[in-house]
Each structure stands twice: as C-alpha cells, then as structure tokens.
Amino acid sequence: MSGAESYRHITVLLNEAVDALAVREDGVYVDGTFGRGGHSRLILSRLGDAGRLIVFDKDPQAIAVAEELARSDKRVGVVHGGFASFQTALDGLGIGKVDGALFDLGISSPQIDDGSRGFSFRFDAPLDMRMDTTRGMSAAEWIAVASEQDLHEVIKNYGEERFSRQIVRAIVAQRAESPIDTTRKLAQIVAQNVRTRERGQDPATRTFQAIRIFINRELEEVGAVLPQVMCRLKEGGRLAVIAFHSLEDRIVKQFVKKYSQHEPLPSWAAVREADLPDPPLKIVGRALKPGEAEIAANPRARSAVLRVAERTAGPIPE
C-alpha cells in the first residue's frame, strides 16, 4: 500500500449525502473534500459519460489518490487547494453553473491515524496539523510566536475549552524554556491543566481541535464557500454539507436559514410577502444524523450532521 492508501477511511453518511444531491447523469458536480474518494466514487457511479466531477482537497496524500482516479476516469477534474477557492477554480476549468456540491467537513481518518501528521495526541510526532503540508505555518511554529491573547482566543473559542486560561499560561511558561514542538509535549501540558475530565474524552481533545481548526482556517473557509456555491448552483441544484463540529454546523445552519426565507417586511411596506420572489435557497428535509448501526461500525460518525439545500429560481440578495 502507498502512504496515501495505508490508513483506513470509512466515509460517513455515504449514501445519504449522495442521494441528497439527486445526481443527474449529465450533471456537473463538486466534491469539495475528496479525502479518499468515498463520496466521489459513488457520485461517479451515478453519472453518465457526459457528466463531470470536480474534486478539491488540500492534502497532498488525498490529491495523489484523486489524480490516480482522474487518470482512469476522464470525467474527473482535480483541484489541489481549499474549497474557499471554489469560484476561481471553476473559472479556471471553464465551468459555469453546477448541479450540486458536497462538503464533508473537518479532518479525515487517514489524517488522524497517520501519527506523522501531528494531528493526534495518541502519537508522539512533530506538531504539524496542516492539512496541506506544502504551505503555511505548522502548529508548532504558531505556538512559538502567538501572543498569549491569541492562544487564549483560539483555544477558548474554537475548542470551547473551559480551562483555556490555565492551559495558555502553561504553554507560555513552557515555550520560554524549550519549544513545544511535538504532540506529546502539548498533550502533557494540557493534561496537567485540565482539572475536570470528560468521560470518554482525552483532556487534550479540545485544545488539539482548536489549534487544528485555526491552523487550517476551517471555519473561515466554510463561511467563504457557501455563498460561492449558492451563486454557482443551477436552479434545482443541491448543496449538501456534513459537519462534525458544532461551530461548523452553526455556520451552515445559519447560512441556509438566512437564504431560505424572506427578510421580515416592515409594517408600512406596500408589498406582501406572498408577492416577493422566492428566496434563493430551499431547505430539503431535516438535518440528518447517522443511525445506530453506522455509529457502531464507525464511532467517529457520532457527531456528524448532514444539511441539504436546493437552489431556487429566486434572485440572490445583493
């Protein structure tokens, strides 16, 4: 097995997410988070010869798998980069409107389970945490130079960590003596400063999650891509997003809610709401979570939430 394929990945909500796209044989679709291609391969199985699938990923290992797939299937186009470049990338490929876009947010199992990537406190490895290891600042580099206030804001806001102040003070004290450059060093600092343990959760979980989200600009990218997708969806096109973190899901939920209803009209308005054009999005079904069987087979699916919206003929507000 190659390095790109040696870590098992179970795609979460596989059929549900692809079913939500209502794939047309001749449609153009985007998988904004290729990973190891679970969703992409199922989409391809439902596309005809005239269909196209554009896949995005930051991770060089994921891109290696995607490019191998593209060599054997000419319907596939590959973008090495974050999905925040959605419209620019589609423009570069000569693609206008699309029939659907799927995003499976957060970190993949191969990234967690490859100790050398520095995402997990289960391994002693260089503290990297970059999804794209070819660019940007590693977690260790950021921890070395970040202000105490920045460290606190990231760990408190992105990790929702109650003991962020204590953790940050310990980080600042330790880095003055020696670099915090491995996952074990950071995990030990956190463990010594988290007074209350959550059942079934390592004390370092929230801090590692927070730093990873910050290093990879995960929340900013979600917020940036959603309006781009809305602009590029054809009428009837679908947006499907799987979120694993409450902050990600909140961004998706609020966006879809905002653009699936009208702004309240003032009492003096001369027009009735019924006379207004449709909002640009329509919510499709309820938020969907994995069933007990899927969670039993893949415990990492437990926190997943799938939300789906459909583009209407309504104009996008300026």
Curated annotation (Swiss-Prot):
Cellular compartments annotated: Cytoplasm
The enzyme's E.C. designation: 2.1.1.199
Reaction it catalyzes: cytidine(1402) in 16S rRNA + S-adenosyl-L-methionine = N(4)-methylcytidine(1402) in 16S rRNA + S-adenosyl-L-homocysteine + H(+)
Protein name per the record: Ribosomal RNA small subunit methyltransferase H
Organism of origin: Neisseria gonorrhoeae (strain ATCC 700825 / FA 1090)
Superkingdom: Bacteria
Binding site for S-adenosyl-L-methionine: G37, G38, H39, D57, F83, D104, Q111
Family in the record: Belongs to the methyltransferase superfamily. RsmH family.
Cellular component annotations (GO), alphabetically ordered: cytoplasm
Protein task: Specifically methylates the N4 position of cytidine in position 1402 (C1402) of 16S rRNA.
Pfam families linked: Methyltransf_5 (PF01795)
Example GO BP: rRNA base methylation
GO molecular function: rRNA (cytosine-N4-)-methyltransferase activity
NCBIfam families: 16S rRNA (cytosine(1402)-N(4))-methyltransferase RsmH
InterPro entries per the UniProt record, alphabetical: RsmH, SAM-dep_MeTrfase_MraW_recog, SAM-dependent_MTases_sf
UniProt keywords, alphabetically: Cytoplasm, Methyltransferase, rRNA processing, S-adenosyl-L-methionine, Transferase
Broad class of where this protein is predominantly found: cytoplasm
